[in-house]
UniProtKB/Swiss-Prot annotation:
Cellular compartments per GO CC: extracellular space
Modified residues (Sulfotyrosine): Y87
Organism annotation: Canis lupus familiaris (Dog)
The entry's keywords: Amidation, Cleavage on pair of basic residues, Hormone, Phosphoprotein, Pyrrolidone carboxylic acid, Secreted, Signal, Sulfation
Name of the protein this chain belongs to: Gastrin
Length: 104
């Protein structure tokens, strides 16, 4: 009986995972051409049809994925310092090479 419950649970989770992509509507923003002047020709009534995030996109200036990636790549959070401190001891290959260069 327990094995049957486990199988039913796994089946339900698998169906929920695979069906999630089918019920989400595709955004028309993905089909729009990207580029610096591509979004200038959009009319206000067209922006309302893009979805619930269109109001926020209008306030942000309709940045496309390349601009968002560029903005995010400029930002480094405090987690970068934590990762460097936590994993600094793993950098033994570079350190041993530097030590070998310093010896006469």
């Amino acid at each position: 009986m327990q094995r049957l419950c486990v199988y039913v649970l796994i089946l339900a989770l698998a169906l929920a995972t695979f069906s999630e992509a089918s019920w989400k509507p595709r955004s028309r923003l993905q089909d729009a051409p990207s580029g610096p002047g591509a979004n200038r020709g959009l009319e206000p009534h067209g922006l309302d049809q893009l979805g619930p995030a269109s109001h926020h996109r209008r306030q942000l200036g309709l940045q496309g994925p390349p601009q968002l990636v560029a903005d995010l790549s400029k930002k480094q959070g405090p987690w970068m310092e934590e990762e460097e401190a936590a994993y600094g001891w793993m950098d033994f290959g570079r350190r041993s090479a530097e030590e070998g260069d310093q010896r006469p």
